[in-house]
Amino acid sequence: MKNQMNLQFSALSQNESFARVTVASFITQLDPTMDELTEIKTVVSEAVTNAIIHGYESNSDGVVYISVTLHEDGVVELMIRDEGIGIDNVDEAKQPLYTTKPDLERSGMGFTIMENFMDEIRVESTVLEGTTLYLKKHLTNSKALCN
């Protein structure tokens, strides 16, 4: 059995925390460890922030889309998508410390964090059409300390 949730919201920075908490709440039914939950929340935060800041260039008319699929075997699949400006060179964008917004004091570590916290990450992007992140994490059999 699998369970799925879809979410969409305006590309406003204040909605980043909404996305993070909503995804975390949905995932708790798999009883992840606190570390796993924190890692997934961090990844959602990074991906949504990238969509808002880079994809839509802080244009609040954009929409961020998230799909979460939970599998009975403890696999969590995330899809986070924007219809923004896209990424011209994904390999370059994934390099640690690379940022297109140094004036906004962006660290350029978003993709690095996502790659370290998730088991699989795939990025599809088309210039002027947007970017989609596909992320997968295999949860351990451990139980969370609290739900």
Curated annotation (Swiss-Prot):
Its EC number is 2.7.11.1. The lineage of its organism: Bacteria, Bacillati, Bacillota, Bacilli, Bacillales. SUPFAM superfamilies: ATPase domain of HSP90 chaperone/DNA topoisomerase II/histidine kinase. InterPro entries: Anti-sigma-factor_SerPK, Anti-sigma_F, HATPase_C_sf. GO terms for biological process: asexual sporulation; negative regulation of sporulation resulting in formation of a cellular spore; sporulation resulting in formation of a cellular spore. The keyword Ribonucleoprotein does not apply. It holds the Pfam family HATPase_c_2. Belongs to the anti-sigma-factor family. The keyword Nucleotide-binding applies. Gene3D superfamilies: Histidine kinase-like ATPase, C-terminal domain (3.30.565.10). Binds to sigma F and blocks its ability to form an RNA polymerase holoenzyme (E-sigma F). Phosphorylates SpoIIAA on a serine residue. This phosphorylation may enable SpoIIAA to act as an anti-anti-sigma factor that counteracts SpoIIAB and thus releases sigma F from inhibition. Keywords: ATP-binding, Kinase, Nucleotide-binding, Serine/threonine-protein kinase, Sporulation, Transferase. It catalyses: L-seryl-[protein] + ATP = O-phospho-L-seryl-[protein] + ADP + H(+); L-threonyl-[protein] + ATP = O-phospho-L-threonyl-[protein] + ADP + H(+). GO terms for molecular function: ATP binding; protein serine kinase activity; protein serine/threonine kinase activity; sigma factor antagonist activity. This is Anti-sigma F factor.
